[in-house]
């Protein structure tokens, strides 16, 4: 694999390197040599396609950054949302934010802006970007794996709180995913090098000559490891865990108990987990679908079709696969917004602060109809992680008296919500109004 370590720029590096060898830029033969004309046709986008790609990637980058920043703000700011599962979702948002910042802009800049596809960001950025890109994708994939284990344990050990993933354990798992991702991406920090091509233009790509004659074999082994550990193993784990979860959920019943309150608590937890599982399954399925075309195009097809660089419109094919993979970082916040009322309310709250000129219908509903929100709080009772054993009895994100008036003495965030605070109510008991 070339620059990018399995995150999408490797095939582009191969394409541009081959193109630079054939096209003979700035030479009179460019319009005379049929082979060069064909390569121009394959490797150069039309001006209209360039503008379309620039517009698409610019919108994608802004949406990815904005959405994942909102996810981070909502979880970090509201203390009651700092549950074990949400800590893992926070880590996933950080990984998607890294992809948004380091993968999307730098992967297409040199091809869309400059026809000679030069590298403009210097030697240090050449090595650092390849490392950060690969690390971010590993982090995203294995965070999904940890989330699947969290949901699996919540279902399998519903009546055994000590076995569940607590917030402290979630932090340990987050640290483990970072260490693993850094170690897996570390080789790219030393093998990706800045160089000048035969035309004297700055370029960036992998150089495995450090390993001597076995460099090519080492590269193939590393590429295979990246494909297996970045995609195959995570997807296999996700399929196994969620299949087991599905079988367990739909075929199990909550055991009878003499204590009615305890039984109700277990039933509520079971139902809440059943609501959450489809959301994380959807996130995992979209990860598989979004990344599969690009990984096949990078790691599988070149092994069976070495002449892939001579395929007509290969660059268009690559942009489609790359754009689809990058769009996964945007869809996760959208899923949270659609599937979970708490995230939706938090998004509306922070969006009203960041973009005060925009009016949100649901935010108006929450702020203008406080009493209605309390009467219909089941409508807004989406729970992110109701099964964390270390979670304290839940309250609303802002505290209200029973009359529905804001109790500013007990509200840590009263200054944020001002006179018309955002209401996020957790439905734990009939008497839990505060």
From Swiss-Prot:
Q: Does the keyword Membrane apply?
A: yes
Q: Which residues are glycosylated?
A: 207
Q: Which GO terms describe its biological process?
A: determination of adult lifespan; negative regulation of feeding behavior; negative regulation of locomotion; neuropeptide signaling pathway; positive regulation of egg-laying behavior
Alphabetical list of InterPro entries matching this protein: GPCR_Rhodpsn, GPCR_Rhodpsn_7TM
- Gene deleted: what happens? Eggs are retained in the body as normal during starvation but the number of eggs laid during the initial refeeding period is reduced and satiety-induced suppression of pharyngeal pumping is slower than wild-type. Suppression of serotonin-induced body fat loss.
Q: Which residues lie on this side of the membrane: Cytoplasmic?
A: 77-86, 150-169, 248-277, 332-434
Signal peptide location: none
Q: Which cysteines are joined by disulfide bonds?
A: 126-204
Q: Which SUPFAM superfamilies does the UniProt record give?
A: Family A G protein-coupled receptor-like
Location, primary (coarse class): membrane
Show the GO MF annotations. neuropeptide receptor activity
Identify the keywords attached in UniProt to this record, alphabetized: Cell membrane, Disulfide bond, G-protein coupled receptor, Glycoprotein, Membrane, Receptor, Transducer, Transmembrane, Transmembrane helix
Subcellular localization: Cell membrane
* Membrane topology, as annotated: Multi-pass membrane protein
> Main role?
Receptor for the LURY-1-1 and LURY-1-2 peptides which control food-related processes including feeding, lifespan, egg-laying and roaming behavior. Receptor for flp-7 which stimulates serotonin-induced fat loss. Serotonin induces secretion of flp-7 from neurons and binding to npr-22 which leads to induction of the atgp-1 lipase and subsequent fat loss. Acts in vitro as a receptor for the flp-7 FMRFamide-like neuropeptides TPMQRSSMVRF-amide, SPMQRSSMVRF-amide, SPMERSAMVRF-amide and SPMDRSKMVRF-amide.
* Full protein name: Neuropeptide receptor 22
> Which organism was this protein described from?
Caenorhabditis elegans
